[in-house]
Swiss-Prot record:
Source organism of this protein record: Chlamydia phage 1
Reaction(s) this enzyme catalyzes, per UniProt: ATP + (deoxyribonucleotide)n-3'-hydroxyl + 5'-phospho-(deoxyribonucleotide)m = (deoxyribonucleotide)n+m + AMP + diphosphate
GO molecular function: ATP binding; DNA ligase (ATP) activity; endonuclease activity
EC number assigned by the record: 3.1.21.-, 6.5.1.1
Keyword Ligase in record: yes
Family, similarity comment: Belongs to the microviridae Rep protein family.
Name of the protein this chain belongs to: Replication-associated protein ORF4
Function: Plays an essential role in viral DNA replication. Binds the origin of replication and cleaves the dsDNA replicative form I (RFI) and becomes covalently bound to it via phosphotyrosine bond, generating the dsDNA replicative form II (RFII). In turn, viral DNA replication initiates at the 3'-OH of the cleavage site. After one round of rolling circle synthesis, protein ORF4 is linked to the newly synthesized ssDNA and joins the ends of the displaced strand to generate a circular single-stranded molecule ready to be packed into a virion.
Length: 399
């Protein structure tokens, strides 16, 4: 299903892009951007035909493309040399008697350090919790291997892929439901035996799956359940069934954090075949996100069980993509907004960049974020969120 955004939503999202990042990468990628400025009056426009950018050697190929897109969208914001002089973090040096070279830098997340990995796992946990809110039934399955099928004790993704296919067919045939998964494979802390944790969204085993109670836990005092029917579908060992509480969901979704101990990546000492594996269905939490999108954009946070979380990157990228494709915003005004605010640099550049943009309000009225945000809130009740008619037959109501 594709969704459409109205002018109120995009106006509030513009304010959302100004928020400072919730975390700080410990090993950011810092591109250096340089451009040539003619030495004339302070209000002369920079000759952007001579614009050029230099990157540090630690940039990877795919990250260079991201930086280039970000840099190419800041030209309008840095047009006037008078405002350029007001920014302390811009350095200037004479190139010759007629030109000066100005430069600035901004960090991009490395996506590999513990802070970046923690941010990604938290985003996935928030998405999984939102997906669970969209269903009446959810469950957690623990798939183990018996001694006959343990083999070399190396996780094989094909095992879980085939089981998911069998379970989808089983649930669709007997219950007529569509389900989603979030699965993490890991090795036990004591004996190192491989097993899988799986969250099933939209279904939980019932008496028809032949649930059998047994005593488990550290002291064998906890009542747990195993399913004989799911064991037949799994074929490699036992299948334990548990309730899908928020704690269980966050444990599975944020398991990736267990690999870091005092900033040390424990997976770096493992071969690729021995590393833990994680897989998830597409678009987790999407329906719940769009159902409460107005509320989330108004507070600029996602509130779950009293805790406030930032927007996962998946939702930010989706909103930016919808705005870029929607014909309603194919105007000169919104093209300018997309160019300045909805690009990669909108949420990658440091807070100093946005402080500098506020200095441009008198020169570029379109960048007056406060008035734009207040005007959007006044018309909040008159705006609706609806999908494209070509992609959805029914009415999608968010009220």
């Amino acid at each position: 299903m594709r969704y459409s955004l109205d002018s109120y939503l995009i106006s509030v999202y513009i304010r959302l892009t100004q928020r400072k990042s919730d975390y700080m990468c410990t090993n950011p990628i810092i591109p250096i951007v340089q451009y040539k400025v003619p030495v004339k009056s302070s209000l002369d426009v920079v000759d952007w035909s001579k614009f050029r950018s230099n990157f540090k050697a630690n940039l990877f190929f795919f990250e260079k493309n991201v930086v280039r897109r970000a840099v190419s969208n800041v030209d309008e914001a840095f047009r006037f040399t008078e405002q350029l002089k007001q920014v302390s973090y811009l350095s200037t040096f004479d190139l010759d008697g007629y030109h000066q070279v100005k430069q600035f830098s901004f960090p991009l997340p490395c996506r590999k350090c513990s802070e970046c990995l923690q941010k990604r796992s938290k985003d996935l946990a928030v998405q999984a919790t939102m997906e669970a809110r969209s269903h009446e039934e959810n469950s957690v399955l623990i798939l183990t291997y018996d001694n006959d099928h343990l083999g070399d004790n190396i996780l094989d993704y094909d095992h879980i892929r085939v089981f998911q296919k069998r379970l989808r067919r089983y649930v669709d045939y007997h219950y007529g439901k569509k389900i989603k998964f979030l699965t993490v494979g890991e090795y036990g802390d004591k004996k190192g035996r491989m097993h899988w944790h799986m969250i099933v969204f939209g279904w939980k085993p019932k008496s028809e799956e032949q649930l059998e109670p047994y005593l488990g836990g550290k002291y064998r005092t906890d009542v747990r359940y195993r399913s004989r029917k799911l064991k037949e579908l799994w074929k490699f060992g036992y299948v334990d069934v548990d309730e899908a509480t928020d704690g269980n969901i966050f444990y599975v979704a944020r398991y990736v954090q267990k690999k870091f101990v005092v900033g040390c990546d424990l997976d770096s000492s493992k071969s690729s075949s021995r590393r833990e594996k994680k897989t998830a269905s597409q678009a987790l939490g999407l329906d719940y996100f769009f159902s409460y999108l107005r509320q989330f954009l108004k507070t600029k946070r996602i509130v779950l069980n009293g805790f406030r979380y930032g927007f996962p990157r998946y939702f930010k990228d989706l909103l930016r993509k919808l705005v870029s494709e929607d014909s309603e915003f194919d105007t000169e005004y919104y093209n300018a907004l997309r160019k300045r605010l909805l690009s990669v640099c909108s949420y990658s550049m440091v807070n100093k960049y946005f402080t500098y943009l506020e200095c441009l309000v008198e020169v570029l009225p379109v960048l007056n974020f406060h008035d734009l945000y207040q005007r959007a809130l006044r018309y909040m009740d008159q705006s609706i969120l609806k999908p494209h008619a070509s992609d959805h037959d029914g009415e999608y109501n968010t009220t």
